[in-house]
Every structure is written in structure tokens, then in C-alpha cells.
């Protein structure tokens, strides 16, 4: 039987683009782990994606995951849009290249070994775990130490 893991994620950007951060809260039974990281120059959507990638890559074995995020972009992208993007050689319905393709590929790889129940939560609505992740993401954005490799300014 796979471990039942609850994951909460958030991304933040001070300016868009600007310094950004990720916030992650992983919960297994009574154990919790928090992750915060900051990037010098990025976008809010890249931080939302990176938060989920970082969370899933932290898991050492296949798990049954309930993943909570306030990002409709991330949730719709991984549960709806990615199938056509892959079929269309990473082109959006407009014919233009999919933005953040590098991270979508990483996220697609990260989900393969897990069973994931995707849950959208309304941001800034008093959801305790989402608020914790928001604080972690903002702290990362305020103290960036990493390059967002793959970020392509427009």
C-alpha cells in the first residue's frame, strides 16, 4: 500500500518577472516538512510549477498524493492542456511554443510514479496550509539564492 501524502504548494513573485520563491508543505501522518527557496529572476507561473516539482521530487518512493494548490494554471496545465501540447510537439492552440515548456516536461516526469489527486484551493482565503506556503514562498522571493535555469525573458 502506498503512503498517503498531503502536499500544499505556492509560488510567489515580487514583480512579474522579478525575484520569486516557492513554498511547500508536505504532510505524512503526524510528520511535516516545509520547503522554501528563492530565485533571482522568474515569473509567478514558473514558481507555481517549481513548487510542485520540488515537492514531488522530495518523495523517495511512489506515493498516493493529495496535492493542494491555488494555481489554476498549474492544475489545468497538468490535468487538461498537457495532453494536446505533447501531441502538438509542445505548441499551444495558437501555434506558438508552450510557455515554461522546460518545467512542464519536468512536472510531467515528476508525476509519473505517483497517484495524484489534484485539489485547487482559493488563495488568500484563510486556508491555513496555503497561507503557510504563501509565507514560505514570499520568504524565498525576499532572499533569492538560485538561478531559474530555463527562464526565458520575453
Curated annotation (Swiss-Prot):
It comes from the Bacteria. It catalyses: Endonucleolytic cleavage to 5'-phosphomonoester. GO terms for molecular function: magnesium ion binding; nucleic acid binding; RNA-DNA hybrid ribonuclease activity. Its cofactor is Mg(2+). Gene3D superfamilies: Ribonuclease H-like superfamily/Ribonuclease H (3.30.420.10). Pfam families: RNase_H (PF00075). Its main location: cytoplasm. This is Ribonuclease HI. It comes from Pasteurella multocida (strain Pm70). The lineage of its organism: Bacteria, Pseudomonadati, Pseudomonadota, Gammaproteobacteria, Pasteurellales. The gene is rnhA.
Amino acid at each position: 500500500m502506498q503512503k498517503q501524502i498531503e502536499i500544499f504548494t505556492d509560488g510567489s513573485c515580487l514583480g512579474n518577472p522579478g525575484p520569486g520563491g516557492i513554498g511547500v508543505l508536505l504532510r505524512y501522518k503526524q510528520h511535516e516538512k516545509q520547503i522554501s527557496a528563492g530565485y533571482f529572476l522568474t515569473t509567478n507561473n514558473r514558481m507555481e510549477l517549481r513548487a510542485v516539482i520540488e515537492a514531488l521530487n522530495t518523495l523517495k518512493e511512489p506515493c498516493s498524493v493529495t496535492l493542494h494548490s491555488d494555481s489554476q494554471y498549474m492544475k489545468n496545465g497538468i490535468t487538461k492542456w498537457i495532453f494536446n501540447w505533447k501531441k502538438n510537439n509542445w505548441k499551444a492552440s495558437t501555434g506558438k511554443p508552450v510557455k515554461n515548456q522546460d518545467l512542464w516536461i519536468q512536472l510531467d516526469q515528476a508525476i509519473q510514479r505517483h497517484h495524484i489527486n489534484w485539489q485547487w484551493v482559493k488563495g488568500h482565503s484563510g486556508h491555513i496550509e496555503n497561507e503557510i506556503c504563501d509565507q514560505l514562498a514570499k520568504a524565498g522571493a525576499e532572499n533569492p539564492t538560485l538561478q531559474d535555469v530555463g527562464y526565458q525573458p520575453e
